[in-house]
Structure formats: C-alpha cells, structure tokens
C-alpha cells in the first residue's frame, strides 16, 4: 500500500504505464511474467504478514521525499502491530478488503477490555455452546488486531478451521488461550479439584472429567480460610464461596459440616461444593487480594441472572443437611446418663445432715416422686480412713438388708459411681430426736418421752433378737416421722454377734457409752447376751437427753466425760415420775448382767401406764402429734369441765337469772375438742394432755379444777 502516496502526488500527465516501468527495470528477472508469478506467490504465502519485500521493491521508483513519508507511516504501523493490543469490538466479524484509497484510522484500546475477557472466561453454557465460527473468531482476534486496511479476514470458514489447529504459545497470545471442552456442570475454578465431579446419568451425559488451567487475568478475593475444630475430622469439601466469584451457573446446596464455616465476602450468594482446595496449598488467613473484588463479582451477578438450569447432585459426603446433623446425638450423651445413681431414678436434693464418713441428702424419684435419704461417701483407695469407712458401710448394708421392722429405717439399695458410694434409705421427716428437741423449746414432756421410749425398745428388741447390737443409740441416730413413730438409724457401729464371745471394741459416743466398753470387760466375757446391755445403757442416757435437752455429763469434755462414766452413774432428773426414775435406775446398772433386756423393759410400769384402758391408745397419740381432731363432742355431764367463765363471780343474781344464764351458755358454747385444750394447756408439746383419763371415765372435777376453768359452785 506504499504506492498510494505516489498516486496522490503524481503529475496529471503521467500514465499508469509510465509509472510502472521502473518496476520492470529494477526487477531481478527480465521476464515480466515470471516476476508477476513470484509476486503472486509471495502474496499468497505472506497473507497474514506485512510483505515488506514486495512493498519495498514497489517504493524504489519514488522520490526521496515520498520514501521518507512512507517510511514514517510504515514505522507507525509496525509499532502498532508490536504493541500487542487486544481486539476491538469490530474484530468479532470478518471485514472484507476495502477498495478505497483512503486509509482508515486504527481503533483505540478500550479500558474495559480486561473485564470483557474475564466475562468471556467466566461464561458457562453460553461460551460452551457457541458456534465454531464465533469461537474461532474470538480466538484469532486475541492476537494482533487486523484492520480493514491490511485485510486478512476475508477468508472462508474452511481455511479458518485449518488454521485453528495451530496455537500461538508466545507470551503475547497466552491470555487468549481457549480450551473447547464438553458441557459439564462443574464451575470454573482457579484450583484443581481432587474430587471428580459426579456424572449425571439421568440426562444422558456420560462425559469424562476435565481440568481447566488457571487464567492469567483471573481475579478473586482471598477470604479467611477455616481452621479445623479440635475433635472433629477435616472437611471433605470446602465452601466455594471462599472465592468471591461463583462461575458455575448451576448452584448446589451449601455443604453442612460440624465445624466452623468459611467466612465469605459474599455470604448471601449460593456456593457449589464440587471443587475443593488442593491439599498441598497452605491455608491462608486474612489475605486480601491485590485485585479489586468487584472485577469478577459484577460480571458473575449479571451472568447468573439469565441462567435457568437443573441443580447439581450433591457430592459424596455432603448429603447430610443441617437438620439431620443437629438430630444426631453426641457420642458423649450416653456417658452423662450413666453418671446418675440408680439408673437415673433418684435425683440429689438438699443437704440434711453430715456424718463421720459422708453426707446425707434428700433424693427424689424421677418416675414416682417418692423421697429417700441418700448417703454419699467419697472413696479414697489410698486413705486408711476411707478403707475403714467402706468397711463400715458394707457392714451397715449387710445388716440393713436383713432387717424389716416399723421401728427401723428401711434399706432401698446402694451403688458405686466413679469415686463415690451411695446408700439409699428411707426418708424420715421431720428428722431426728435431737432436731425435735431443738424445735420444741429444748425439752419434752414425760408422756412424749414415754411414747418415744416404747418405740425405741420395740426396735431394740427386734434387733437383739437378730443377734445384732447397735452400739450407738443416741438422739441423733433416732428418727421421728410425722406420726410420732421413732425409727432406729445409722447402723455404722452395729455388729452382728456370731461366736460364743462378745468381742466388742471401744466404739460409740462418750456421753452415751456404757462403762464396760471403756473398761474392756466385754472382751473377756464369754456370754454374748451381755453385749446387748450396752444398748440399754445408751437408752437411759437418751431418755435423759429427751427429758432435759442434753445428754448426761455434757458439761465435761470428751475425756473427762469418759472418766465420769467409768466412776459414776448419770444423775436422774428430779422432775420425773417415780416410774420414770425406777426405769432409769434399771438402765444404769453398773453390772451389765443386772440390766434388764429390751423385752423386759417393755413390760415396765413406766411404759405400761400409757397402755392402760384409761389412757389414749398409741394411734391416738400419733394423731394428737399431727394435731388431728379425734374425739366426739362430750356428753352433757362433762360440759362444765370445759366451760368458760362468761359471768363475773361477784355478781349477785337470782335463781331464775342464774338458770336462764346457764341455759343460754349451754346453747351458745359447745365443748371444745382436745386439740384446743392441749394448745391452751401446754405451748411446748401437743402430747401434754394425754395423762388425763378418757372423757367417759373422767371423775367429777374437784374444786381446784373448777377454779382453773372459771366455773363457780353456784353454776354447778
């Protein structure tokens, strides 16, 4: 085309023939036909090249000025070719050779060329399903741009197909490298997935797996990579939202795994779990991409809006959903169930007492709501005291499992959980006799002491008949229920006598201990029946504790109290009845052989007085203890005993007024029940009114009784 300036600046008198003559004179061969064939061959061989040799020969006949002007234009055109500019929008279609003599200006490079190329790389099904001519045109246009001046695009599709097998791998054309692959459902990713994509047999696409090389201008935003949670396996699939672009037009559900999820810059966008990060690639924490994240995000958003395809099948290992994962129980859950005692039947409640070797709690049954006393003891295998404690607990369990009596606490069971030992016993409320004394002004009436003593002896008689000695009878080990029934508890010091000798060691509490235990006489005695006498001595000390509120010799310390027990007998309270004093003298016999047994003491008049027909029965005592109304309204004969003085004594009344007033009082006031009488007579105990005879056999009140009730002799 360098002969175009010569046409523009030639004189009008010159002709085409004269202008072409220098070409023949400067040719290498004198044959014009041969030169034309050679030129035709060069044009055909260097169609896509510049053809400098031929064009330079045609410019040899020009003047110096024309040659300089043509060389400037040639240098400008050559620099344009070597700059490696990307294609213009007009390069998508072939432009025919223009016959015009006026050269067209070259297009300028566009700023959004990189974004358009990324859009082409990020396309899914649209780029895969394009026609071959469009694909070849795009691939060819990624090289040096061809303008309409030099031509080269006016060729048929057959020649273009032949040339398409040759690829230019130079650094200038590496960005335009394309791979024609079959349609697959996996997204384009800059990383190779070690897990192959599952093939969909339902659509009939039985296609091989593929690998896409990374693009040199691929842009993504590197997010925070997750850290493995301790105790959980590493995930099989990473969340593809780790890259800010989702190049797959087909979106699968996000995988769920019991670990920390990957934080993505685009959390609201769906992801595909088919591609995972290469295991050899080290994880990156909080690495920001040097490229702007909006570069590929905007293209992807516009690309995904127009897709309507079938969803991908879930990959292996990612089929569990969040609901199913949440419903799977933790492997540590069954271990927690085994930590509850008695197969999760009893739940520990509040603390109700502490002993020498453990604590006692209130436990409730989770199925029935029943209550029991749970004794808890910590186990220390290397501690000698703990070994002794375990020995006593085993002895207590062995004894209680063979005892069944209304005046002995019932044994439910026992077990060992980890380093703790549990014993489940009958729960007796409100508690021990010691607690009962503190809650009732520190003392008891003799009638209450008599009733409690009878219950204690009943349990001791049964226990001694089983050849078992308790050895720790005191107020703290005697429990009282709401009905006033006393039960023996705490058999840690108990011993079952099997041999012919009563070999008892020094065990028990000093204030309630028998003197023979301190003198070690029982170890030399051959009569085992004398061993039961230690419980009778302890019973006498407990009676004093109930009557006075403290055990004998309580003013002394432990060692001094032991010396007092060895030398003297406990003092008997002076306020007790003669029957009560005689009962205590029998219990405090220094010689154990002279002490009566529990069965013999049950026949003592101190206890028989409460069993006579003139006194309420045992059931009546228990009902009075509960504050129940147990009597019927009294007869007319006994009403004056319970009348209140409503008329002044010094008031002078006629006989008619007195009779009318007496009738009015009889109609207005009824005899109150025993509960009201008991509450008025004794604020300390509800059993203080028991010694009086029953209403049917009650004698006529004396003058002193009439004064106490406020009834005058005139009213009678």
From Swiss-Prot:
GO terms for molecular function: ATP binding; MAP kinase kinase kinase activity; protein serine kinase activity; protein serine/threonine kinase activity. Induction: Induced by chitin. Levels are regulated in a proteasome-dependent manner (at proteome level). Residues 31-40, 124-137, 634-648, 703-716 have a biased composition (Basic and acidic residues). It comes from the Eukaryota. Disruption phenotype: Normal morphology in standard conditions. Impaired chitin-induced MAPK activation (e.g. MPK3, MPK4, and MPK6) and altered subsequent disease resistance to A.brassicicola associated with reduced levels of chitin-induced callose deposition. Phosphorylated by PBL27 during chitin-mediated signaling in a CERK1-dependent manner. Changing residue 677 to A: Impaired PBL27-mediated phosphorylation but normal interaction with PBL27, and loss of chitin-induced MAPK activation and callose deposition. One of its GO terms (cellular component) is cytosol. Residues 75-91, 138-150, 162-173, 242-251, 610-633, 652-661, 674-685 have a biased composition (Polar residues). Changing residue 685 to A: Slight reduction of PBL27-mediated phosphorylation. Impaired PBL27-mediated phosphorylation but normal interaction with PBL27, and loss of chitin-induced MAPK activation and callose deposition. Gene3D superfamilies: Transferase(Phosphotransferase) domain 1 (1.10.510.10). Belongs to the protein kinase superfamily. STE Ser/Thr protein kinase family. MAP kinase kinase kinase subfamily. This is Mitogen-activated protein kinase kinase kinase 5. It comes from Arabidopsis thaliana.
């Amino acid at each position: 085309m360098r002969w175009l300036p010569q046409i523009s600046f030639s004189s009008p008198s010159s002709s085409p023939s004269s202008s072409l003559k220098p070409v023949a004179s400067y040719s290498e061969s004198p044959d014009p036909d041969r030169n034309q064939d050679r030129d035709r061959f060069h044009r055909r061989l260097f169609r896509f090249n510049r053809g400098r040799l031929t064009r330079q020969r045609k410019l040899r006949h020009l003047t110096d000025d024309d040659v300089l002007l043509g060389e400037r234009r040639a240098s400008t055109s050559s620099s344009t070719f070597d700059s490696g500019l990307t294609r213009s929008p007009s390069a998508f279609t072939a432009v025919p050779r223009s016959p015009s003599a006026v050269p067209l200006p070259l297009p300028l490079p566009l700023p959004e060329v990189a974004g358009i190329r990324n859009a082409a790389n990020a396309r899914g099904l649209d780029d895969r399903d394009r026609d071959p001519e469009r694909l070849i045109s795009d691939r060819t246009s990624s090289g040096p741009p061809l303008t309409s001046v030099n031509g080269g695009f006016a060729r048929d599709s057959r020649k273009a197909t032949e040339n398409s097998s040759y690829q230019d791998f130079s650094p200038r054309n590496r960005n335009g490298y394309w791979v024609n692959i079959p349609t697959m459902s996996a997204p384009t990713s800059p990383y190779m997935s070690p897990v192959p994509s599952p093939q969909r047999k339902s659509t009939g696409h039985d296609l091989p797996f593929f690998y896409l090389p990374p693009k040199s201008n691929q842009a993504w935003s590197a997010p925070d990579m997750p850290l493995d949670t301790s105790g959980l396996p590493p995930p099989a699939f990473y969340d593809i939202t780790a890259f800010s672009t989702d190049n797959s037009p087909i979106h699968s559900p996000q995988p769920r795994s019991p670990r920390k999820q990957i934080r993505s810059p685009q959390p609201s966008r769906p992801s595909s779990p088919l591609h995972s990060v290469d295991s050899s690639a080290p994880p990156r924490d909080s690495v920001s991409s040097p490229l702007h994240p909006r570069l590929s995000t905007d293209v992807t958003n516009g690309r995904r809006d127009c897709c309507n395809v079938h969803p991908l099948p879930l990959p292996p290992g990612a089929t569990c959903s969040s609901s199913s994962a949440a419903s799977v129980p933790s492997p540590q859950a069954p271990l927690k169930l085994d930590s509850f005692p008695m197969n999760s039947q009893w739940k520990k409640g509040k603390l109700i007492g502490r002993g020498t070797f453990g604590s006692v709690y209130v436990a409730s049954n989770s199925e029935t709501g029943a209550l029991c006393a749970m004794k808890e003891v910590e186990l220390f295998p290397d501690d000698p005291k703990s070994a002794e404690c375990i020995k006593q607990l085993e002895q207590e369990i062995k004894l209680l499992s063979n005892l069944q009596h209304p005046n002995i606490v019932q044994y439910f069971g026992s077990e060992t959980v980890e380093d703790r030992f549990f014993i489940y016993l009958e729960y007796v409320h409100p508690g021990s006799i010691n607690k009962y004394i503190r809650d009732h002004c520190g003392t008891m009436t003799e009638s209450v002491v008599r009733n409690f003593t009878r219950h204690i002896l009943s349990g001791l008689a049964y226990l001694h008949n089983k050849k078992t000695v308790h050895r720790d009878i005191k107020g703290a080990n005697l429990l009282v229920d709401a009905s006033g029934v006393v039960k023996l508890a705490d058999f840690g010091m108990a011993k079952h006598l099997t041999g012919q000798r009563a070999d008892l060691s020094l065990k028990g509490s000093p204030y309630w201990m028998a003197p023979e235990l301190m003198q070690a006489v029982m170890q030399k005695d051959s009569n085992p029946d004398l061993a039961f006498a230690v419980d009778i001595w302890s019973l006498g000390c407990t009676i004093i504790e109930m009557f006075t509120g403290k055990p004998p010799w309580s003013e002394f310390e432990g060692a001094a109290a032991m010396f007092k027990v060895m030398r003297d007998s406990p003092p008997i309270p002076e306020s007790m009845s003669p029957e009560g004093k005689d009962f205590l003298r029998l219990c405090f016999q220094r010689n154990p052989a002279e002490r009566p047994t529990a069965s013999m003491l049950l026949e003592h008049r101190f206890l028989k007085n409460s069993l006579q027909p003139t006194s309420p029965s045992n059931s009546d005592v228990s009902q009075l203890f509960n504050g129940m109304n147990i009597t019927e309204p009294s007869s007319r004969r006994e009403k004056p005993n319970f009348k209140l003085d409503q008329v002044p004594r010094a008031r002078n009344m006629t006989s008619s007024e007195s009779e009318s007033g007496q009738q009015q009082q009889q109609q207005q006031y009824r005899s109150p029940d025993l509960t009201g009488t008991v509450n008025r007579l004794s604020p300390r105990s509800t059993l203080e009114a028991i010694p009086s005879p029953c209403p049917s056999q009650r004698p006529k009140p004396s003058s002193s009784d009439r004064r106490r009730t406020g009834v005058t002799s005139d009213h009678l």
